[in-house]
Regions:
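Non-catalytic accessory segments flanking enzyme active sites
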Residues: 65-142, 343, 352-355, 359-374
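Glycine-rich "HGGG/HGxG" loop immediately N-terminal to the catalytic nucleophile
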Residues: 109-111, 174, 187-201, 235
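Short beta-strand element of the alpha/beta-hydrolase
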Residues: 143-151
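The serine-hydrolase catalytic nucleophile loop
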Residues: 152-164
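Conserved alpha/beta-hydrolase
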Residues: 166-192
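Conserved acidic catalytic loop of the alpha/beta-hydrolase fold
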Residues: 204-222
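C-terminal subdomain of alpha/beta-hydrolase-fold enzymes, centered on the catalytic histidine
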Residues: 290, 298-452
Length: 452
């Protein structure tokens, strides 16, 4: 427990962290009276005297939880095979059985647990809930503070491979002046953060909490980035424009114009006069909403109902998440081309062990908006610089024409040739290069010293 005297937590600089080989690193420099919090503890019940403290965090799940998981996996009651030769009915039986066979026999959760525990992880209480986060400081004195937000069915694991390139660019083909300090929180209800006990934790509220987090860490100025829900939250922060937020970067932008959204919602043909890129975006989104959006409808309307099965069956949870890995990676429906089995199972197992199937789905219920539509996301209200990278495997490829209309303060737009919805996870080096380029103009703004 922490003493009554507020103590400062110091994260080791990135120079001492061999991320490239994901080795176990040196211990954190922490006050002797601080004890690490484990994942087994109730992160919704921090003592009152820790209301604004920043506490070290370590993951440790009881071995009984892992034994229970393996027993459930091995006892799966499998259904019959799909009646089509493709993925049009969902995850194919043979694909899921191959993944689950590995999960139940050879997969080792302890590897990723050790990898995460080698990172400087912390927890702090904001707006009544504990927020867990990774915080890695660069050894470069003028590093730009960068807040990164994950989405669903992702987690902080999406960004582990980017920490080295972002914080220590000279070892990864970059320049010293491209360095970032990196802050990667788990959203409320996700991973190792606390689970909301009341309604109201929508993207706007999360955005406010993230600004509190960055200010609590001592950053006067910073930038924010995200994909999936992370994009929605970055947009929300852009609208809020808290003091010190210099700009945002999103890789799932909300660009669909009102007239196009109306036609799509009505099931009408594409409006006349669309360019080739605009028509391709319209067709991609029409296919998504007509054939692939069932997961979202369930979580928007009945997160509790769908969650019972996901909380009780690890294979049900795996299928629910693997379906999105197959559809949203730049892999042609074969996610193992973009992510390893271990990477996918690390994420699935994190959701299972943290019991976050329902709590993560509740964010959809809280935000029943179309996250692709510019009007729903009120992107025109964003007054700070906005950067956008379009990845070819994203749910839709935002056209430059729509993006400029949606974001009047668009400062950077780039279409890349690989990567999908899980951009940082699939292409960590490319993702890093995009953030370097997107935020480089903001480093020299007069009167905005970046680091504390």
């Amino acid at each position: 427990m922490q003493t009554t005297k507020q103590m400062e937590l110091i994260a080791a600089p990135a120079k001492s962290w061999p991320f490239a080989k994901h080795a176990v690193i040196t211990s954190l420099i922490l006050a002797a009276s601080l004890m690490p919090m484990t994942a087994a503890e109730d992160s919704n019940s921090a003592p009152a005297n820790q209301a604004s403290s920043i506490r070290p965090f370590q993951i440790h799940f009881p071995e009984a939880d892992l034994v229970d998981l393996r027993n459930r996996v091995l006892a799966t009651r499998w259904p019959e095979k799909e009646t089509v030769p493709d993925q049009s009915q969902g995850v194919q039986l043979a694909k899921l059985q191959a993944l689950v066979r590995y999960w139940g026999t050879d997969y080792d959760w302890h590897k990723v647990e050790t990898e995460l525990n080698a990172l400087p992880m912390f927890v702090t209480r904001i707006d009544g809930i504990d927020i867990q986060f990774i915080h890695v400081k660069s050894r470069q004195p003028n590093a730009m503070p960068l807040l990164i937000t994950h989405g669903w069915p992702g987690s902080i694991l999406e960004f582990v491979k980017t920490i080295g390139p972002l914080t220590d660019p000279t070892n990864y083909g970059g320049r010293a002046e491209d360095a970032f300090d990196v802050v990667i929180p788990s959203m409320p209800g996700y991973g190792f953060s606390g689970k909301p006990q009341t309604t109201g934790w929508n993207p706007d509220r999360i955005g406010h909490a993230w600004d509190v987090l960055m200010k609590r860490l001592g950053y006067k100025n910073y930038v924010a980035q995200g994909g999936d829900w992370g994009s929605v939250i970055a947009d929300a922060m852009g609208r809020q424009a808290p003091a010190g937020l210099l700009g945002i970067h999103v890789n799932m932008p909300a660009t669909v114009p009102t007239e196009v959204a109306k036609a799509m919602n009505a099931g009408d043909p594409a409006p006349a006069g669309l360019s080739v890129q605009e028509r391709a975006a319209y067709d991609s989104l029409s296919t998504f909403f007509n054939k692939n959006a069932g997961y979202g409808i369930m979580m928007v309307t009945r997160p509790q109902t769908v969650g019972y099965g996901l909380m009780d069956s690890p294979v049900g949870l795996a299928a629910w998440m693997y379906d999105k890995f197959a559809q949203w990676t730049y892999s042609g429906g074969d996610p193992e081309r973009s992510l390893t089995k271990d990477e996918m199972l690390d994420d699935i197992t994190l959701y299972w062990l943290s019991k976050s199937a329902i709590s993560s789905a509740q964010l959809y219920w809280e935000n029943n908006n179309n996250n692709f539509n510019a009007a729903d996301q009120k992107t025109a209200d964003i007054k700070i610089p906005v950067a956008v990278t379009v990845f070819p495997g994203e749910i839709y490829q935002a056209p430059r024409s729509w993006t400029g209309r949606a974001y009047p303060t668009l400062s950077y737009f780039h279409e890349v040739n690989k990567g999908g919805h899980f951009a940082a996870w699939e292409e960590p080096q490319l993702y890093t290069e995009e953030l370097r380029a997107a935020f480089r103009p903001l480093r020299g703004i007069p009167g905005t010293a970046l680091n504390q």
